[in-house]
């Protein structure tokens, strides 16, 4: 327990908060180039083939990012935009690729929650 004099001389240090997405370097999004696009399996008890990409960012980091939605057009050398946000059942995946920007196409035939998947509003069917 420090004395009051010790606290005056040298005040307590605030505990630094560790960021959950260090590769973004305090930016909301970052641009990057896909170096590898592949599928991986989730932790127990889930079972699937999750689509992910290894992305080299403009900040110099190389991270693994999740590709949300059904179907995608990404391949090696595609330029993508990533945002923060982890995937709970994929260890080490702390970023999401933003659909509908740069080389990433939006999800086809999506009717609900379109803004999250970069899909334009569908034209109404003619009668």
Curated annotation (Swiss-Prot):
The modification 3-methylthioaspartic acid is found at residue 89. Residues 113-127 have a biased composition (Basic residues). The keyword RNA-binding applies. It holds the Pfam family Ribosom_S12_S23. InterPro entries: NA-bd_OB-fold, Ribosomal_uS12, Ribosomal_uS12_bac. One of its GO terms (cellular component) is small ribosomal subunit. SUPFAM superfamilies: Nucleic acid-binding proteins. CDD domains: Ribosomal_S12. One of its GO terms (biological process) is translation. The keyword Transferase does not apply. Keywords: Methylation, Ribonucleoprotein, Ribosomal protein, RNA-binding, rRNA-binding, tRNA-binding. Residues 102-127 are annotated as: Disordered. GO terms for molecular function: rRNA binding; structural constituent of ribosome; tRNA binding. Part of the 30S ribosomal subunit. Contacts proteins S8 and S17. May interact with IF1 in the 30S initiation complex. With S4 and S5 plays an important role in translational accuracy. Belongs to the universal ribosomal protein uS12 family. This is Small ribosomal subunit protein uS12. The lineage of its organism: Bacteria, Bacillati, Cyanobacteriota, Cyanophyceae, Nostocales.
């Amino acid at each position: 327990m420090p004395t009051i004099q010790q606290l005056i001389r040298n005040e307590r240090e605030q505990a630094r908060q560790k960021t959950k997405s260090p590769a973004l370097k305090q930016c909301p999004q970052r641009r990057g180039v896909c170096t590898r696009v592949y599928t991986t399996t989730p932790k127990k008890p889930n079972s699937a083939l999750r689509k992910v990409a290894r992305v080299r960012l403009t900040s110099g980091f190389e991270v693994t990012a999740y590709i949300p939605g059904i179907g995608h057009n990404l391949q090696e050398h595609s330029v993508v935009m990533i945002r923060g946000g982890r995937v709970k059942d994929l260890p080490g995946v702390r970023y999401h690729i933003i659909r509908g920007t740069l080389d990433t196409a939006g999800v086809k035939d999506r009717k609900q929650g379109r803004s999250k998947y970069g899909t334009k509003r569908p034209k109404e069917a003619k009668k």
